[in-house]
UniProtKB/Swiss-Prot annotation:
Keywords: Signal. This is UPF0065 protein YflP. Residues 1-22 form the signal peptide. Disulfide bonds: none annotated. Belongs to the UPF0065 (bug) family. Pfam families: TctC. It comes from the Bacteria.
Amino acid sequence: MKKSIILLNILLIFMQGDIRQAAAPRLPDGPIEIVVPAEPSGGWDVTAQAIQSVLRQKQIVKDDVHIVYKSGGGGEKGWKYVNKSSKQTISMTSSLILSNDLLGQSKLKMSDFTPLAILSKEWQTVALPKGSALTNGKDVLNEINMHPGKVRIGFAPGFGNDDQLSFVRAADMYGIDPFDIQFSQYDSSEQLIQALIRHEIEAASMTLSEAKPYERNGDITLAAVTSDKRLPGFPNVPTWKEQGIPFVFSHWRGILGPKNMSEEEISYWDQALKKVTSSPEWKRKINEQDWESFYLNSRETKRFLEEQSAFYQSIMTGN
């Protein structure tokens, strides 16, 4: 009997240890902030609001979730804020944080943050104002060829982002010197669209989800998309490939946190964001926006960002 009691006590100790190890990881108490390093509206904002909504509805986190807007410097202001914030603060990110570094526009590097997740990807498009004499992407490129430095192409929010780089890449593949393109930079997609509608620019390079509501309203038309084939929601929008330019390019969005997050804190977000991206609500939002689900956890994200950094360096240097 005595041996049985001792054995039972040993088993209980091991079970308690297992329970402690299996306990869900936690963040310090306090409200969670999701930083949008741009103006309200646009893809980062839509993504942040979707995350906030699912975290609240599904009660994935116990504390409240706030969205904080920090626009300026092509994401720089927002990422500096995250860099100095508590462990309850996370931020939207994209390839812009990589290109800012590669172009020497920022002292911040990806190593100054903790990669937490990649969430989704979507396609880039070239938009034209209603009544434009141009009809497709090739028309835009031909116009630049005929009038170098005269055709205004808008993008937002920061130099070196995917909106700008995707257009540069398509133009380069068509034989256009990037210095012959007159770019106009805007602080938000809303400002960009309004400039396009007012014919202040000849075309705008942007994500498909940002262009969609204005295309549906008939305010703009779409001249090209960077997908490999026509998209079901946009059957009349030709790909660059159809126009003789073998260019396929997707834009991704993700989440980062402050530097030096603990393994427990990283694990917390691995679990929380996995639940978010697995939820029906998230999948509905993905479909509404014509995005593609592209969830990567923290470890996969770190590896992905290393690959993307090399990819963007090759685009910018031509090597």
